[in-house]
UniProtKB/Swiss-Prot annotation:
NCBIfam families on file: PRK02655.1
Subunit and partners: PSII is composed of 1 copy each of membrane proteins PsbA, PsbB, PsbC, PsbD, PsbE, PsbF, PsbH, PsbI, PsbJ, PsbK, PsbL, PsbM, PsbT, PsbX, PsbY, PsbZ, Psb30/Ycf12, peripheral proteins PsbO, CyanoQ (PsbQ), PsbU, PsbV and a large number of cofactors. It forms dimeric complexes.
Function of the molecule: One of the components of the core complex of photosystem II (PSII), required for its stability and/or assembly. PSII is a light-driven water:plastoquinone oxidoreductase that uses light energy to abstract electrons from H(2)O, generating O(2) and a proton gradient subsequently used for ATP formation. It consists of a core antenna complex that captures photons, and an electron transfer chain that converts photonic excitation into a charge separation.
Protein name: Photosystem II reaction center protein I
Pfam families with a match to the protein in the record: PsbI
């Protein structure tokens, strides 16, 4: 049960970091080249 909880925490933290980095790097207001993002 402990390994399952650890795996869930790892997956959740990974997606959160991915979302944060993707939002910061692909922010339309700071990135004029939106054609590359799409």
């Amino acid at each position: 049960m402990l390994t399952l909880k650890i795996a869930v925490y790892i997956v959740v933290s990974f997606f959160v970091l991915l979302f944060i980095f993707g939002f910061l790097s692909g922010d339309p207001t700071r990135n004029p080249g939106r054609k590359d993002f799409e």
